[in-house]
Amino acid sequence: MFYNLKRKFEKNLNKHKIRKEVVDDAGTIETDFWKQHSIGCLSKSSPVEAEIYRKFGDDSTKNYPTSIKANPYIGPELGVSDIRVGEEGAADFHTEKGIIVGNIRMGFGHYRISMAIASAAHALGYEPYWMDLNSYGQTTCTKVIGAQNDLYSMGSRLSQKSRLFNRLVWEPMNYEGFRKLTYNAADQKNAELMAPVYANIPKDIPVVATHVWPAQAALHAGMKYVVNAIPDNWQMALHLAEGSIHTVQTHYAYQGYRILNGMQGNDVLNPMPEDALFYTGHYVDHELVSNIETDCAARKQRKEEGKPMR
């Protein structure tokens, strides 16, 4: 449950700073946890980054204005405000009670988890700010995410039509391709392109990201307190964001991510630091669980009386 995350997060809030990165001439990020990545694995991401700059542009020197607007859809119920990047307006962040919910709106699962985080944060007295990195059309960040989303959607649709494509391409990519540290190495480097959207956001406000890209981008931008809420129980290096607190929903996921299971073939890797990974339970909306005992008792009574369960 999110409430476990709150206790863990508050306990570790002051001690979890971004670990200092030492960047060598090849552009390799080298910290204790990341030394298990090979130099070639990390440096190979540079040509990919150059290609993205060529295709989508480089806005690393842009100073996008940031504003806060009321969310007309979930704002009234969950107290959510939108962070708008590239729009002029008031940006009065609540630095004591504010918490950013970072997402990319890629798939309903990530969106649902974002709503659960915002719901629980609101119930606990925090002020959730909704930061959708896929909604800032003028930025390199959104252009990159949008292109990836289009590509993934095309592959997903094709996998439903072609059994051969699904067997030879789609399933291997999702089960093993995204699992590899080499994939994560390039992804972490590319996330630097997304960092400018955080430029004018106070760095002390916690970020809870429901996809790894908002977490990685936040870290590159210098956000000090980043929680990476991993959605998948199947352990994949895709979901790693070094410097963040990683959270998982099941014991199975905890074991797999702790030992980086299968992320470099059959190699036995150094484990994730104990203070970088926490089992929190499922990410569930406050509204769904706050009355769960009474609701379940009512269902049992209806069953005993031969009435409909719902």
At which residue positions do the language-model features occur?
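A nucleotide-sugar donor-handling region in carbohydrate enzymes
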Residues: 245-310
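A short, charged/proline- and glycine-enriched loop
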Residues: 89-99, 222-223, 305-310
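Structural motif
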Residues: 98, 205-206, 245
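Membrane-proximal helix-turn-helix segments that form the acceptor-binding/catalytic region
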Residues: 194-196, 231-247, 254
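A short, glycine/small-residue-rich beta-strand->loop->alpha-helix junction that serves as a flexible
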Residues: 104-115
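Active-site proximal beta-strand in glycosyltransferases
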Residues: 206-209, 215-233
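Conserved N-terminal ligand/cofactor-binding loop architecture of enzyme catalytic domains
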Residues: 2-77, 115-196
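Short N-terminal or domain-adjacent regulatory/targeting segments
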Residues: 47-92, 227-230, 280-306
